[in-house]
């Protein structure tokens, strides 16, 4: 179950011919209410795609009726014409739903710099609306894939309500948000203000800490829609926990499907002076090509970890840093620790723990190894 697990939502994914080979490439997620509270977070890349620019305006009043998504083209760096294409897409879906275009979020993913084939896209929107149903969540999740090899879906049951979600992303995964489109839905009764606060809290500790290749997309969008169809006003603490779990579940799936990856790496930074320091250190390690290559080669090279830590302005004393790789403390006090031969890097899941010995704050950042397959895939992405 996916975005249609909560009551009040319909979805569909169809093949409109934007991508080759008859693959699904247009999706809609429709909120049939009775409420339409919503919030969204977007890329912090200053080069924002046209659908991001449109959707930032659309979600500003906290009311969203539907989301339309396409894969096969990012509609980024396409100028005023690209923005008009995003507007036209919103207007087209709004007309089909007898609603207003300023209540439609538009998302696109794919190659940057090319206009979308609008006749195909609009025909796809019509087909998706016609097919939209309570069991359409899986097809919708399939339609937003680009280099993803599998669809990503998740849901959780709360006390009288449900939270569902879908996401896409396999490359350009880096804060803010990681390269992703994600639609989250709930049938809980929430205000727009609650949606905003809860979504930001969840993404801050999940999507924002997924960093596979240091490349921030132009199109990142995560939107939360609340239909209120369950009639349940949730306990905020419980809802926040479950929403974070859904986002974390999707993050794990994104990490598992990252382009060319053979290892899923959790970088746990503890003993930091602040959470910001912990995140900064985690990101520095996650983006260090030498470290990522070492993990690919199953080499527990803790020196590369320390070298990455040293590039940050986090508070620490080099002689107080400890590093463990898969539970073996290979570095103690900034120098040689336990026998690195004890480290088993055969499993796909790898945990690197860095103790800065500078405080009590902590954070985890997720990344992958750097592989030959990643280079091959991204050297031929547009050809």
From Swiss-Prot:
EC number(s) given by UniProt: 2.3.1.35, 2.3.1.1
Annotated active site: 179
A molecular-function term among this protein's GO annotations: L-glutamate N-acetyltransferase activity
Record GO biological process: L-arginine biosynthetic process; ornithine biosynthetic process
Catalytic activity annotation: N(2)-acetyl-L-ornithine + L-glutamate = N-acetyl-L-glutamate + L-ornithine; L-glutamate + acetyl-CoA = N-acetyl-L-glutamate + CoA + H(+)
The keyword Membrane belongs to this UniProt entry's keyword annotation: no
HAMAP family: ArgJ
Function: Catalyzes two activities which are involved in the cyclic version of arginine biosynthesis: the synthesis of N-acetylglutamate from glutamate and acetyl-CoA as the acetyl donor, and of ornithine by transacetylation between N(2)-acetylornithine and glutamate.
Family the entry assigns: Belongs to the ArgJ family.
Protein name (database record): Arginine biosynthesis bifunctional protein ArgJ
